[in-house]
Amino acid sequence: MSAVKIEEASVDKLKIHLTATACLQEEDKGKVLQGKLLRSISPESRVKLHCCYGVVIVVLTVAVVALSVALSVRNKIPVMENCEPCSATCPSGWIGFGSKCFYFSEDVGNWTFSQSSCMALDSHLALFDSLEELIFLKRYKGPSDHWIGLHRASTKHPWIWADDTEYSNLVLIRGGGQCGFLSDNGISSGRDYTHRKWICNKSSSICKSKLGNVPRHV
Amino acid sequence: MDAPVLYAELHLANTQGLRCTSPPSPRQDACWGSGWHRVALKLGCVGLILLLMGLSVLVGFLVQKPPIEKCSVAVQENKTEPTVRSTILECPRDWHLHWNKCLFISQTSRPWAEGLADCSLRGATLLLIGDGKELKLLQDFSKGKGQQFFIGLKYVQEDKVWKWMNGSILNTNLLRITGKNEENSCALISHTEVFSDSCSSDNHWICQKTLKRV
């Protein structure tokens, strides 16, 4: 009888031991799963995800707004067809045509005063090289007559430009004066002490390098 | 001895299953999270897609060529001054009333002789200045316009005097001519003085006619 009791006790012990081990293993698995779940749900990773989303959305929104503004600004300032690309390089208050900048005065003065005023602006009274240029100046001058760079010592001397080059007789100069000016009729001349508005011109430094490639304004 | 061992194994297996299945289930519920996160995620995705579409459309517009305008040089138009009218004395259209005269200011510039002819066609003459007040008024007018004007005063080489178009000789106390006294010289009024210019030169001019009672 005592042998049987001893056997039963040992079997019981064995049962308990095995059960405990198995349960422990199960608990370990559960903990592992728990850890995984916690990691996926953890506030840190969630916040990071939200931040990523937020940043991407903000960046895209800013891009869309910027592009919209750029488009609206662009439409307000249309590109001019056949515009001289060099015009933009003229100083404020000057008008560009071809490779030159022209200034039309508001004040009046005699020819010498006009030339001095142009020299003070690092330029000289206007020269024209072509009929197109002359037509442009006539159109732009408005109703008032303007001194230009043509002059001569007397009615018997040849016409020369303000830069001391000889006039090519491109256009007939009428009138009986010693100084040339632009009128509605073309080029006329008056006495040097009379008062008129004037036109200065200078060349644009950037335009000079592009002279061969600059298209004529039609 | 063999029989008791087999029995023990079977018991253990049953015990394991029963004890270990129940604890994980409540934790699995926690894994799903709340519903609003899902909705927020979906909305975020939709927003992103819309933004990307907008971006592509705008880029497309930018790449397109902008509208083209022809060059135009702004020419300042000359505004005509309003005609001064009175119930008794009236000037023709485009003429200006100055005391007892109607004055016409030319819109273009031409030699003196052409100005004279133009005034004649209008039933008038080139301007004659009667006194200092009239001279001052016209000089102020010249200043405002930024222009000079031929008037009806010319140098007569034979008599070596300046004469008005009505034949009277210039009274040098009234106005003084600045410049040359020589052949082919005509008077040009400016904002400060009266010049002698070449009659062949182009200039604007002023016509006058006596006022008629209407």
From Swiss-Prot, chain B:
<dbReference type="GO" id="GO:0051132">
    <property type="term" value="P:NK T cell activation"/>
</dbReference>
<dbReference type="InterPro" id="IPR016187">
    <property type="entry name" value="CTDL_fold"/>
</dbReference>
<dbReference type="InterPro" id="IPR051527">
    <property type="entry name" value="KLR_subfamily_B"/>
</dbReference>
<dbReference type="InterPro" id="IPR016186">
    <property type="entry name" value="C-type_lectin-like/link_sf"/>
</dbReference>
<feature type="topological domain" description="Cytoplasmic">
    <location>
        <begin position="1"/>
        <end position="42"/>
    </location>
</feature>
<protein>
    <recommendedName>
        <fullName>Killer cell lectin-like receptor subfamily B member 1</fullName>
    </recommendedName>
</protein>
<feature type="topological domain" description="Extracellular">
    <location>
        <begin position="64"/>
        <end position="214"/>
    </location>
</feature>
<dbReference type="InterPro" id="IPR001304">
    <property type="entry name" value="C-type_lectin-like"/>
</dbReference>
<dbReference type="Pfam" id="PF00059">
    <property type="entry name" value="Lectin_C"/>
</dbReference>
<feature type="disulfide bond">
    <location>
        <begin position="119"/>
        <end position="207"/>
    </location>
</feature>
<keyword id="KW-1133">Transmembrane helix</keyword>
<dbReference type="InterPro" id="IPR033992">
    <property type="entry name" value="NKR-like_CTLD"/>
</dbReference>
<dbReference type="GO" id="GO:0038023">
    <property type="term" value="F:signaling receptor activity"/>
</dbReference>
<keyword id="KW-0735">Signal-anchor</keyword>
<feature type="disulfide bond">
    <location>
        <begin position="186"/>
        <end position="199"/>
    </location>
</feature>
<feature type="domain" description="C-type lectin">
    <location>
        <begin position="98"/>
        <end position="208"/>
    </location>
</feature>
<dbReference type="GO" id="GO:0004888">
    <property type="term" value="F:transmembrane signaling receptor activity"/>
</dbReference>
<dbReference type="GO" id="GO:0005886">
    <property type="term" value="C:plasma membrane"/>
</dbReference>
<dbReference type="GO" id="GO:0030246">
    <property type="term" value="F:carbohydrate binding"/>
</dbReference>
<dbReference type="GO" id="GO:0042269">
    <property type="term" value="P:regulation of natural killer cell mediated cytotoxicity"/>
</dbReference>
<dbReference type="GO" id="GO:0009986">
    <property type="term" value="C:cell surface"/>
</dbReference>
<keyword id="KW-0430">Lectin</keyword>
<keyword id="KW-0812">Transmembrane</keyword>
<keyword id="KW-1015">Disulfide bond</keyword>
<keyword id="KW-0472">Membrane</keyword>
<feature type="transmembrane region" description="Helical; Signal-anchor for type II membrane protein">
    <location>
        <begin position="43"/>
        <end position="63"/>
    </location>
</feature>
